[in-house]
């Protein structure tokens, strides 16, 4: 029986692909060497220890239908679209060696006529007339007996959208956690016109087979054709949950303020594990009682517009004389906290 396994996903859902990756990693035989090829439709993927409110323009992402996905490995935030090809190499220890998987990718690029080198923070770079440009970034995960190396290759990604979603709004956000390092990037299509997902995947597959001097048939994975993956439903539920993608954020503080006709309002949020740990309010309103009640009731609530909306609606029932003002506050918070 071959020690190699090749899996290709035809799903563009990041939560599906990351759930498949995690399940295969947990269940693979220690003597296997696995290559998983996949890609995601519009998604921001963040590292395990990152804060999405700090890393991403969450409001713009929601407006444009861009998903947020937290991976189980470390590293920074990246934007994926169908112009990216994603790869994952897995192996048991002591066989696992990220320099081997890096070399396989370099060999694949070289077979297409692209000379790239490994550089710095787990990147692959090429030399252009205007200097060194990144074409691939990677992250890693290791357990006691196995490890994986996954990353992306920029083929024909919409680089303008990187700034749309990876530069957060100036929200007066003071956050603990890891901040992404921004790099100068380029698409491989600028070096090799006509390159696409199918061609780069074929090159990576061949380099994988050549390195180990073995060949296997690909297993095509889709929501309609899942391999036997015990625990997949639970893993997918986790990957797609608000609790995992947002609730795992490190502690942070957020200040928002505005002025209405009836007075100014300033809210200070301390957020822990995606929930409001403390809320302070300052206002020059002539009727501060409803706003003070709001601050008190927001403690312990999930830090997302839907949960805060529910508190505001309940408060309007308790303070009917202030319904108009509370509705304004509700609409404002729904906008600034996205």
From Swiss-Prot:
EC class (word): ligase
EC number: 6.3.1.20
Function: Catalyzes both the ATP-dependent activation of exogenously supplied lipoate to lipoyl-AMP and the transfer of the activated lipoyl onto the lipoyl domains of lipoate-dependent enzymes.
Domain BPL/LPL catalytic, first and last residues per copy: 29-216
Keywords, comma-separated and alphabetical: ATP-binding, Cytoplasm, Ligase, Nucleotide-binding
GO molecular function: ATP binding; lipoate-protein ligase activity; lipoyltransferase activity
Further comment: In the transfer reaction, the free carboxyl group of lipoic acid is attached via an amide linkage to the epsilon-amino group of a specific lysine residue of lipoyl domains of lipoate-dependent enzymes.
Binding annotation for (R)-lipoate: 134
Record-listed ATP binding positions: 71, 76-79, 134
Main location: cytoplasm
Catalytic activity as recorded in UniProt: L-lysyl-[lipoyl-carrier protein] + (R)-lipoate + ATP = N(6)-[(R)-lipoyl]-L-lysyl-[lipoyl-carrier protein] + AMP + diphosphate + H(+)
Location in the cell: Cytoplasm
Residues forming coiled coils: none
Pfam families (alphabetical): Lip_prot_lig_C, LplA-B_cat
Keyword Transit peptide: no
Protein name: Lipoate-protein ligase A
Metabolic or biological pathway, per its Swiss-Prot or TrEMBL entry: Protein modification; protein lipoylation via exogenous pathway; protein N(6)-(lipoyl)lysine from lipoate: step 1/2; Protein modification; protein lipoylation via exogenous pathway; protein N(6)-(lipoyl)lysine from lipoate: step 2/2
InterPro entries per record: aa-tRNA-synth_II/BPL/LPL, BPL_LPL_catalytic, Lipoate_ligase_A, Lipoate_protein_ligase_C, LipoylTrfase_LipoateP_Ligase
PROSITE patterns recorded: BPL_LPL_CATALYTIC (PS51733)
Residues of the signal peptide: none
Similarity-based family: Belongs to the LplA family.
GO biological process: protein modification process
Subunit structure: Monomer.
One term under GO cellular component: cytosol
